[in-house]
């Protein structure tokens, strides 16, 4: 549970959700090594102050199922391909973290013997307690579920204090701030307000899952240096949904 002392992090354990697109940097496709290294520094700063970090990464930088689905690709096949993309991203992130001397384990919701370990909740929690970063890949292992839903699910399973969703904007707005200059930023929202206002922060399944299990969500801009440390130590960043 969150701690109250100002000398300690507010959160003991967090689940960080990164979009695959965030790994592209300024490119249109793939993985930017500079972004990986910067993410590793941010995550390493949390480990350094005793925060346990679980990580879920999307796959949109390597595979965009929606476009191929519209062109006739079977939805289930597309989702399976997307799961494989998240595993590739997880392996890349593990490499960056381990180059920064941060012990990291990648677990997959689908068996991939010899490449990554099969997801085991109890093992994951033990690793987190030992100070390892645990990357949860392959989504939930089921088609029709997004990586946002996977992030909320894993966050609930590992009893994280919050799910932190990294985006390209500094919180949740009433409209897309890049398209609407009158868009208003929200500092705090309830789950039901997110659903009623159709703000599109996460998909319906993810929001309902978080609401039903009382999992706080924090939406923030990952491009702001030091943002993760500020969040876990209680500073105001982005939008809190609870």
UniProtKB/Swiss-Prot annotation:
Pfam families for the chain: AA_kinase (PF00696)
Pathways per UniProt: Pyrimidine metabolism; CTP biosynthesis via de novo pathway; UDP from UMP (UMPK route): step 1/1
Keyword Acetylation among UniProt keywords: no
Primary subcellular site in the record, as a coarse category: cytoplasm
GO molecular function, one term: UMP kinase activity
Domain of life the protein comes from: Bacteria
SUPFAM superfamilies associated with the record: Carbamate kinase-like (SSF53633)
Chain residues that bind ATP: 17-20, 60, 64, 167, 173, 176
Cellular component aspect of the GO annotation: cytosol
Keyword NAD: no
GO biological process: 'de novo' CTP biosynthetic process; UDP biosynthetic process
EC number, UniProt record: 2.7.4.22
List of residues binding UMP: 59, 79, 140-147
Alphabetical UniProt keywords: ATP-binding, Cytoplasm, Kinase, Nucleotide-binding, Pyrimidine biosynthesis, Transferase
Major enzyme class: transferase
Localization per record: Cytoplasm
Matches recorded under Gene3D superfamilies: Acetylglutamate kinase-like
Catalytic activity: UMP + ATP = UDP + ADP
Similarity comment text for this entry: Belongs to the UMP kinase family.
Biological function: Catalyzes the reversible phosphorylation of UMP to UDP.
Name by which UniProt lists this protein: Uridylate kinase
Organism the protein comes from: Marinobacter nauticus (strain ATCC 700491 / DSM 11845 / VT8)
């Amino acid at each position: 549970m969150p701690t109250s002392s100002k000398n300690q992090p507010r959160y003991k354990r967090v689940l960080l959700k990164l979009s695959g697109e965030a790994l592209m940097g300024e490119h249109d496709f793939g993985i930017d090594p500079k972004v990986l290294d910067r993410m590793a520094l941010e995550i390493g700063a949390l480990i350094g102050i005793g925060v346990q970090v679980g990580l879920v990464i999307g796959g949109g930088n390597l595979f965009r199922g929606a476009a191929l689905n519209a062109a006739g690709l079977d939805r289930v096949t597309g989702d399976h391909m997307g799961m494989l993309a998240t595993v590739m991203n997880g392996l890349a992130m593990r490499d960056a973290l381990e180059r920064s001397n941060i012990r990291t384990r990648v677990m997959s919701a689908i068996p991939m013997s010899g490449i990554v370990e099969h997801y085991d909740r109890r093992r994951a929690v033990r690793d987190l307690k030992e100070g390892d970063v645990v990357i949860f890949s392959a989504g939930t292992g089921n088609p029709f579920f997004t990586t946002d839903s996977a992030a909320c699910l894993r966050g609930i399973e590992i009893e994280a204090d919050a799910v932190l969703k990294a985006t390209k904007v500094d919180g949740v707005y009433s409209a897309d701030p890049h398209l609407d200059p009158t868009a208003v930023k929200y500092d705090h929202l309830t789950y039901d307000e997110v659903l009623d206002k159709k703000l599109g922060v996460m998909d319906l399944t993810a929001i309902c899952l978080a609401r039903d299990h009382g999992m706080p969500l924090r939406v923030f801009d990952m491009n702001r240096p030091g943002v993760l440390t500020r969040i876990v130590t209680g500073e105001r960043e982005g939008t809190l949904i609870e």
